[in-house]
Amino acid sequence: MSIRIHRFSIPVNCYLFDDSNPTDRRQDFEMIYDDWGFLMLPESYTEDGVPTQLVINCHGAGGTVSTDDSQVEHQAITQYLVANGYAVMDVNGLPEKYAAEYGIDIRNNIGSPISTRSYIKAYHYCIDNFNLKTAVFVHGGSMGGISGTNLVLSGAIPVIAHTAFCPVLDTYHEIFLHPWSDGAPKFAMGKIYGLEKDENGDYIYDESKLHGCNPAKNKKAEVYPVPVKFWQCVNDDTVSFAVTEKFIGTIRTNGGMAYLRAFPYGGHEPQLVGDIVEKPVGISTFEGTAIAITLPRLRV
C-alpha cells in the first residue's frame, strides 16, 4: 500500500469540573464536542503482522487539524518519520464547535485538559482500529510542547520518550505575561479555565484553576516519567529559553534523563538551524520529493 492519511473525529468532554471538590456532583456533567484528528500511515503498514510504531506529533499555535488538512502532515519531521516506517497522529485538541461558541481562536488548545482528553481519545481510537504498537513516542513544537508535556504527565497512555522543539512550558510567563498571536492564547486560557476579570476587564491569573496543566508548576514534571529532549534557540523571543533550561535542569537534578540541545541563534525555529544534510540516515524522500533535513553546526 502507499502512504495514506486517515482522518477521523472523536467525542471529547469539554466540561472542566472542580478537581479540588471530589463530592461535587458537577463532576458528572458532560459537554461533548467532536474534535478532528488524523493518522498518517507509512507505505510499510500492514493490517496484520508486525505493528507499526506510532508517534504523536502535537502541532503548534500556527496551525490546526481540520477535516481535510493539518499543520503537522506538511512538516519535514513528519514526512521523514512516515517515509521511514512510522505512523504519525495529531488532533486539534480544541473542538471546532466549542471554540466557536466561546469565541476562542481554533489554533490555541494551550495544552488544556480538553487537549489532553482529545489526545487520549484519539490514541485509543487509533490503537483500536489500526495495527499499531501500544507504546508511543510524543513530539511537539511550540504550543505543541505544552500539549505534549501535559499528555505525558497525565500518565494515561504508555509513552516511550518525549521530544519537542521550543516548547511552551510555563502558562504564566509564556502565555499569560508574554502572549503571542496578539494575545489569542491568553484569551483562550481565560475562556477555557474560566478565569475571573478585574475592574478593567483583564483576566486575573489563577494557578488553582489550571487543573495541573502548567508543567512549570507541576510536581510530576520534576521526576519526569520518560526520557525527554528539547531543542531551542537562545534568542527565541516567543518562548523563554530560560524556562526550558530550568525545566530540564530540575529533571536532571532529580536523576531523570533530560536533555536540552541549545543553539545561539535561530529564533523560534530550531529545526531550521544549520545546513541541509546531503545524505541523511534512512529514506530522505517523501512521495518523490526530497525532505529538507538540517544539521545544526553551532551549539552553546
Q: What is the predicted function of each stretch?
A:
Residues S181-E245:
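The feature captures the conserved acid-bearing segment of alpha/beta-hydrolase catalytic domains
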Residues E47-T52, N57-A100:
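Short substrate-entry loop that stabilizes the transition state in hydrolases
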Residues M1-G49:
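N-terminal cap/lid segment of alpha/beta-hydrolase-fold proteins
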Residues F130-S142:
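Alpha/beta-hydrolase fold nucleophile elbow
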Residues G140-N150:
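Glycine-rich nucleophile elbow surrounding the catalytic serine of serine-hydrolase chemistry
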Residues T149-D202:
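Hydrolase active-site cap/lid region
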Residues D237-T238, E245-V300:
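C-terminal catalytic histidine-bearing segment of alpha/beta-hydrolase fold enzymes
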Residues N108-F130:
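Alpha/beta-hydrolase active-site loop
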